[in-house]
Amino acid sequence: MQSDSAPLPRVEYVFETSKFRMTSRANEARLRLTNECPILVRPHEPFIMPTGIHFTRTPSCAFILTGETDKDVFCHTGLIDGGYRGEIQVILLNKRKYPVTLYRGELNICLSAFNYVLPPLRDVSFLTPPMYANDAGFDVMVMHSMVIPPTTDQPFMIYLGVETPGPPEPHVALALGRSGLASRGIVIDVSEWGPRGLQLKFYNYSGQPWLAQPGSRICQIVFVERRHILKGFKKCLRHRKLAPGVRFREARVHFREDTNSVRKHTHEDNPVHEPNVATASADIRGTKGLGSSGF
C-alpha cells in the first residue's frame, strides 16, 4: 500500500474541446467534465461524443469512464485501457421512442483510475485473453447463437453458472460492456462475477434484434483490486455507483495536464504521442477502438 507521503502515480493528458468544460477540483483523484453545448440523442441511434481528452502518459493502471444525467439516456460505462492513446469518447443511448436533448450542464463525465491484475486462468472455453499490451479485460464469447431483442422496459438476462475462474482475494471480477457493441446500441449493466456465477443484463437500444453468432464477444471481464469495490461499512466512503450493489472507489492518482504536448486544431497535425500506424507494434493498442474493445 502506498504511504501518504509518497508521490502519487501521475497521469498526463491533453484537453482540447469546446464541447465540455473541466469541472474537477484541484488535486482531485479523477477527471470530471460537464457538457457545454446541447446534445441531441435520437432513438435507436447511439451517439458517440468526443470528450477532447487524450492520455499522453499513464502508470500501470486502467480507467473507467462513467456518465451521469437525469434524462432518459443510458451512458455506457467504458473501460479505457492504459495503452490507449486515441481521443476518449462517451457513448450515449436514448432509452425512449422520442428524441432527448441534454442541455448545458446536464451531462457529467468522470474518468477514474483503478488497479487490476491479469491472472493465469485455467481453461475457460468462453474467455479469451487481452489482445494488446496494457489491456485490462478478458473477452467473453458466446458458445451458441442467441438473439437479444430490442429493449422495452426489462433487460435481456443471461446467467453463467460458473464460479469465477480468477484469483481469490484481493481481487473482484467485474463484467463491463464492450465499446464496439455500445456503438451499435448493445450495452450491459456492470456486474460482479461471484462464486455462484455471473448474471449479465443486456439492453438493446438499437431498435432491431441483435444476433450473436458463436464466437461473438459480448462483454469483458476485469479483475479489479478488491479495495476499489466497497462492501460492508466501507460503503459509507465516497464512491461512484457503477450499478446496484457495485460501489466503486478510484485509485489515488495525480491527473496533470501535459503542457509539453499541445493538440492543434488542424487535421494535418499529428495527434499527441500517438504511435504512427505504419510503425506501431502489433501488440500496442494506440488509437485502435474506443478505449478498450474496438468495432
Swiss-Prot record:
Top-tier EC class: hydrolase
UniProt region (Disordered), positions on chain: 260-295
One function term, GO molecular function aspect: metal ion binding
Catalytic activity field: dUTP + H2O = dUMP + diphosphate + H(+)
Parts forming coiled coils: none
Alphabetized UniProt keyword annotations: Hydrolase, Magnesium, Metal-binding, Nucleotide metabolism
CDD domains: trimeric_dUTPase (cd07557)
A single BP term in Gene Ontology: dUTP metabolic process
E.C. number: 3.6.1.23
Pfam assignment, any one: dUTPase
Binding site for substrate: R178, S179, G180
Gene3D superfamilies hit by this protein: 2.70.40.10
Cofactor(s), names only, from the UniProt record: Mg(2+)
Biased composition (Basic and acidic residues): 260-272
Similarity section: Belongs to the dUTPase family.
Biological function: Involved in nucleotide metabolism: produces dUMP, the immediate precursor of thymidine nucleotides and decreases the intracellular concentration of dUTP to avoid uracil incorporation into viral DNA.
Name of the molecule in the record: Deoxyuridine 5'-triphosphate nucleotidohydrolase
Gene that produces this protein: DUT
